[in-house]
Amino acid sequence: MTTDTIVAQATAPGRGGVGIIRVSGPQAAQVALEVTGKTLKARYAEYLPFKAQDGSELDQGIALFFPNPHSFTGEDVLELQGHGGPVVMDMLIKRILTISGVRPARPGEFSERAFLNDKMDLTQAEAIADLIDASSEEAAKSALQSLQGQFSKRIHTLVESLIHLRIYVEAAIDFPEEEIDFLADGKVAGDLQAIIDNLDAVRKEANQGAIMREGMKVVIAGRPNAGKSSLLNALSGKDSAIVTDIAGTTRDVLREHIHIDGMPLHIIDTAGLRDASDEVEKIGIERAWDEIRQADRVLFMVDGTTTDATDPKEIWPDFIDRLPEQIGITVIRNKADQTQESLGICHVSQPTLIRLSAKTGQGVDALRNHLKECMGFSGNSEGGFMARRRHLDALQRAAEHLLIGQEQLEGYMAGEILAEELRIAQQHLNEITGEFSSDDLLGRIFSSFCIGK
């Protein structure tokens, strides 16, 4: 339970029609009394003067008091809504700080107190910052879903399933004299597989949510002179890369951060992949592969004037064999202005094929729409939940321990090891919602918030 009271401006710094000062803690009611000159009625908006220590008026506006526990932080909360000039806001905060027991809030401290007082879990607290920082309607929808608890519900469902399975497994361990072999009756294996399948579905949606938040990493790869740099320029809308007819012009990695309808993408142009004798080009090609291995999606560039093939395994089997399985691939047949091919997307099973001309820009809009779809943009959906890198890491660790437990069950009927792996997996899932989190982790998360949130 906190004993100090915090204050900060809740609205963005700068000039505005309205500025809001937020106060939270046991001294909030005293602050209201000293600044407004009266005891405020709970959850009732009153238009009042805001007074300095000598009784002179600093400003006038709306005062709202929310007694605990029915407030954002779960503590007594006061909001003063005055004129939004920076001087006025600063004068009000300085006035409030003259009252004993009040100090300036740290970044994210209001949300941190809401979390510590069980007003929201950790994913919901993080969703507040994500909603504020959303760069597209789709990202805002996803952040709102997390704020409303959609992500948390999925995690809680997994945790509940793990708890029930742990009870069953540990009962089998504790009561070995029972005639029924609980570990071999099929229920444990079936329930464990159902949890793994459910976790895989959550991981897939969380990965989509992380892309929505952090942006999708798209690597343009292919042989020299396929038009990779021209495509980077076409997508970024500027001449980021040097374009010539000389194969191997690009020898290093080029990056551009762009937005498509507000959705962030990190576009990376790489050196043409081939067996190079030049030492500098070799380094560039190895860097290209480093980027490819970390990509969310690879745009496989093909010079349409050199082949009629559309299957990347036929065009370049060595490249496909070396490409990690989890990375999505889109085949780009470039130079359609010369081959006179029909432009746009052609879904020939998988991967997706797009015909375009990077030089003229024809067909590039089809690629932009395709990339939006890959990021989860639908235009009319409610949006999935938002996720962060730490969520993905925790989900992955949980999945790894479940798979270890499954191997021990299937191979050795090792109930004790399975029970321990289930416990560790549950612990990793609890880290996501904050039911098990170190103080250091909480400090890092909330320090990234705005002051006043």
UniProtKB/Swiss-Prot annotation:
It holds the Pfam family MMR_HSR1. NCBIfam families: mnmE_trmE_thdF (TIGR00450), PRK05291.1-3 (NF003661), small_GTP (TIGR00231). GO terms for cellular component: cytosol. Its cofactor is K(+). GO terms for biological process: tRNA methylation; tRNA wobble uridine modification. It is an enzyme of class 3 (hydrolase). Exhibits a very high intrinsic GTPase hydrolysis rate. Involved in the addition of a carboxymethylaminomethyl (cmnm) group at the wobble position (U34) of certain tRNAs, forming tRNA-cmnm(5)s(2)U34. It comes from Vibrio vulnificus (strain CMCP6). Keywords: Cytoplasm, GTP-binding, Hydrolase, Magnesium, Metal-binding, Nucleotide-binding, Potassium, tRNA processing. InterPro entries: G_TrmE, GTP-bd, GTP-bd_TrmE_N, GTPase_MnmE, MnmE_dom2, MnmE_helical, P-loop_NTPase, Small_GTP-bd. Mg(2+) binds at residues 229, 250. GTP binds at residues 225-230, 244-250, 269-272, 334-337. Homodimer. Heterotetramer of two MnmE and two MnmG subunits. K(+) binds at residues 225, 244, 246, 249. It is found in: Cytoplasm. Transmembrane segments: none annotated. Binds 1 potassium ion per subunit. (6S)-5-formyl-5,6,7,8-tetrahydrofolate binds at residues 22, 79, 119, 453. GO terms for molecular function: GTP binding; GTPase activity; metal ion binding. This is tRNA modification GTPase MnmE. Its EC number is 3.6.-.-. Residues 215-376 form the TrmE-type G domain. Belongs to the TRAFAC class TrmE-Era-EngA-EngB-Septin-like GTPase superfamily. TrmE GTPase family.
